[in-house]
Amino acid sequence: MKQFRAFVTTETKKNTFNYSIQEKNLADLPKSDLLIKVQYSSLNYKDALSATGNKGVTKKYPHTPGIDAVGIVEESKNKNFPINSSVIVSGYDLGMNTPGGFSEYISVPSSWAVIKPDLLTSQDSMTIGTAGLTAGLCIKAIEDKKSIKGINAIVSGATGGVGSISVALLSKLGANVTAVTGKKNSHQFLKNLGAQQVIDRNQFLESVRRPIGKGLWDAAIDVAGGETLSSILCSLKY
C-alpha cells in the first residue's frame, strides 16, 4: 500500500493537542471520486483553528487540516476529471472534517473540484486561495450593483488575506480605497497595495457618529465585524 506524509493534529488527552508529520497509507483516506496528489496548499485562519483543536471547526481528531489544495488527479471515477488533470479544491468540508491539503494526498468528491485554468500556475492558485476567492466574490457583488471605477470604497481587516486582496483588486479596478487596520506598522504595506488612505481602527470607530453618520462610502468589504461593521454601516451612502 502506497504511503505518504501528512500534517496531523492529535488529541492526546481532553482538550490537549499535539501535531506532527506522520506517515499515512492511502487506505487511511476516505473512499471518494478523486485521488489527488497535492502540489500546494495555503494557510487560512480556519486551518489554524483546526490545527490547534477547535472543535467548532473539526469535530474528531486525529485530523489533517488544509481547506485549500491544488494537485494532479491520480485516480478518478468521473470522466470530467481525467487522470493527470490539474485540479483545485477549496472549501466544502476539506480540512474541516475531511482530511485536508496539509498532506501529500487527498481523496474528495468530484463536486468539490474544478479544473485549474491553464493561465494560472498551481502555486499562484494557492497564493490566491480561499481568501482570494472570497475577495473576488465580494468585488463581484459590488460590480453587480455599480461600476467600481471612481467609487469610494472602505475595507476593514485590511491586512488579512481577504482584506489585503480586496484592497489590491479594488484599487486596480479604479476605486478610491480606504483601508482600516489595527496594525500601526502596516500602513505603508496597505498604501503599496493601492490604498489611498489608511485609518487606524480605533480612530475610525471614534470618528463615526451613530446611529446615522455622514454618508462617505459607496461600497464596503468588511472582514472584522462587530463595532467596525456597525460603524461602516452608519457611514455608507444610502
Task: Describe each region flagged by the PLM.
Residues S147, L193, Q197-Y238:
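Glycine-rich cofactor phosphate-binding loops and adjacent beta1-alpha1 units
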Residues M126-Q203:
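Mid-domain Rossmann-like dinucleotide-binding core that forms the NAD(H)/NADP(H) cofactor-binding site
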Residues K46-A51:
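Cytochrome P450 core scaffold surrounding the K-helix E-X-X-R motif
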Residues K2-F7, L34:
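Short structural boundary motif marking the start of a folded domain
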Residues N25-L43, N54-L94:
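Glycine-rich beta-strand-centered segment in the early N-terminal region that forms part
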Residues P30, P82-I83, T121, I148, ...:
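Residue-level recognition of short, solvent-exposed, well-ordered loop/turn junctions
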Residues N18, S90-G157:
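NAD(P)H dinucleotide-binding glycine-rich loop of Rossmann-like/cofactor-binding domains
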Residues V87, A153, L216, A220:
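Receiver (REC) domain switch-region micro-motif
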